[in-house]
Amino acid sequence: MKKNRHSRDMQNHKKPMNKKVLEEEFSSELGDYNAGKIIETLEVTKPEKKKEKNKKQQ
């Protein structure tokens, strides 16, 4: 019996999204004029979180 290979397929399943499309989509759902800025804020803070994790491990 052959094993399923779902994990390899899932790596190719995730597609990069356009920032502008995400901003338009989520800003209308949240109902706030500057809600699209949340995405920019998250992208700015991601590298900082990675640095913090590396410092904690050392």
Swiss-Prot record:
Residues 1-20, 38-58 are annotated as: Disordered. It comes from the Bacteria. This is Uncharacterized protein YkzE.
